[in-house]
């Protein structure tokens, strides 16, 4: 089948990706989420899809404590509910039918999350495929978000999700508050704390007002 392969300009597939893909079962699946690792060979948590999206505040807390309950085992094939635009392989026909679910308003963060969630809501199945690997040179390591403007998009786009998909809601109000609080909680680990706080404030303000687009 004709396919589209998604990855950022700071990521790249391993050699022989098409050969590995040709060995996968494409009779039951049209969307595939690859295994994404950083340049040190460690799994990129930010690119790991959800088996089940932690939507409520209780699920969000449980996800913080036991993230493995919501994420696939790194080396195990399983169905997932979301995708990352680093390492997604998709049938071109399915992509063309769902182009309207890729929103420029969610620039940088949550655009892929939203897209995958909408695919599943439409009845599509997504296969987490660790046989296919991508390398991603990530700039967010542990609790340090660098450059600081990235937290703006993390906060703003989290709020914009509710406007783009009011029903069914991806995250509850309390779940969103908890997720936003997390970015304040990791303030001590940031290099430029006042700049970081400024972008959190702007992200929340613009998210509540429905302001989108590039802002850094």
Label each residue range with its predicted role.
Residues 1, 28-29, 124:
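Short, high-confidence coil segments that cap the C-terminus of an alpha-helix
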Residues 1-10:
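Short beta-strand-to-loop acidic/aromatic patch adjacent to the donor-nucleotide binding site
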Residues 10-12, 106:
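Acidic metal-phosphate-binding loop of nucleotide-sugar-dependent transferases
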Residues 16-47:
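Conserved donor NDP-sugar-binding/catalytic core segment of glycosyltransferases
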Residues 52-81:
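Short, flexible, basic/aromatic active-site loop/helix in glycosyltransferases
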Residues 82-83, 87-101, 105-132:
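A short, conserved alpha-helix in the catalytic core of glycosyltransferases
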Residues 121, 125, 135-156, 191-195:
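Nucleotide-sugar-dependent glycosyltransferase catalytic core
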Residues 149-157, 167-216:
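Non-catalytic, C-terminal membrane-associated alpha-helical segments of glycosyltransferases
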